[in-house]
Amino acid sequence: KNYTKEELNRSIINPAQIKLVLETYRDAVYSEMFNEPQREPDMNYLPKTLIFALNENHATNIVRIAKKVFGHENDDTFVQKITYSSGDSNELIRQFRVNREFRIAVTCTLVATGTDVKPLEVLLFMRDVASEPLYIQMKGRGVRTIGDEQLRNVTPNAFSKDCFFLVDAVGVTEHDKKITPPSDGPTTKLITF
């Protein structure tokens, strides 16, 4: 079945769907994604994961459900929301970079652009993105390189970061994006030599 954007957004907001996506990710992370022999499966050192949520409420629900799915219901560090309403977002981003216990960050757009989290190994999309420039920026969060020793400082069971995984729960990779032309500004003329 092909879903409309509205139907798709409803399905990812549904707590049962969020739970299913997170359980599927949890079950695949060491069996299908990070299954190299030198990487010991350890959910306490889940690869640093950034989840893109639709809005603030969606992010809150994802955090709540992720705590249950990953067995960290009484842990306020393992999975956290980084949004404009989360308090000191710069400090949260810094903690996500360096704190071994902070494994999953959930954001709407705050960490989508211009933020460097080198040990990030997984991007999980639970929202669609129509804008090509925004989508490219969001994907760019995963391509940052990091030295092996630096990675192991925050993810002790990691060996090296040779790639990152983009987990597409909503079909974000399957459709064309829009490039909005600039408005109310000077036009750009391209000259090539």
Enumerate the language-model features and the residues they cover.
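Interdomain helical connector at the RecA1-RecA2 junction of SF1/SF2 helicase-like NTPases
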Residues: K1-L46
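Long, largely alpha-helical accessory region at the distal end of helicase-like NTP-driven motors
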Residues: T4-R10, L20, T24, V170-F193
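Hydrophobic alpha-helical scaffolding
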Residues: E7, S11-N14, F52, E56, ...
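Structural motif corresponding to the C-terminal cap of alpha-helices
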Residues: Y25-E36, F70, F96-T109
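Conserved helicase motor "Helicase C" RecA-like lobe of SF1/SF2 P-loop NTPases
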Residues: S31, M43, A53-K81
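Pre-Walker A (Motif I) flank of P-loop NTPase domains
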Residues: Y45-K48, F102
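Conserved RecA-like P-loop NTPase helicase motor core
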Residues: N74-P182
